[in-house]
């Protein structure tokens, strides 16, 4: 239960539950103390046998090893890997809309997440939402949320936007850590930024800089062998293909200003947004 001592992490789990109330995507990955204690050794072994199977696996490698040697090692160490794959039926999740929840806790700082339904990882606008998220509240210091709320107004200890996209669903959100006295103002300023993205087209220069910055971040990420290895494996697992960096550049370059605004109008609908707050006890 130690993770409950970190409200800035716990709020993300509870926000998932708020938007996916009747679906496994809304369940806490760690489970509960009761559920974990209920597992037997045999249950865990059988679960691994049914789900961690060769048919579901991808082996990814980056570094000073040629492909034939990698295949030889894989065959040597994984040739006896067996399993009885479970066939899971998946129900497309319903994303709840307009949910408002305020929770009082024994904390000093306040926390807020605003968000709603996004798009799936297979959606034609997936590259667009990656750029939109990066522009709005990505890791760079010049993101809109960081500049206008944390730097200009000084009312957020931390602020960021995020997207969680799955095979058939997705959500977006904005997290901010602030004080009880400034949480309402922080909320208003976040809504203001979303409204601007909905109602006002990006300038040509701003859009060009956003593309360049996103591609620069992707290029830097590829300098890490671990990041590249993980990215290649995930791409093959999800899409059954691996895009070269040149192909990624082509996708980003093909984005249009109108496409970004239309996407913002689609997902940043004010009457469909949900909100979760953690605030200190009175």
Model-derived segments and their meaning:
Residues 92-96:
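Short, charged, surface-exposed secondary-structure boundary motifs
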Residues 1-86, 91, 102, 112, ...:
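Charge-rich, well-structured scaffold segments of protease-associated domains
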Residues 97-108, 112-116, 124:
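Phosphate/diphosphate-binding glycine-rich loops and adjacent basic-rich segments that engage nucleotide
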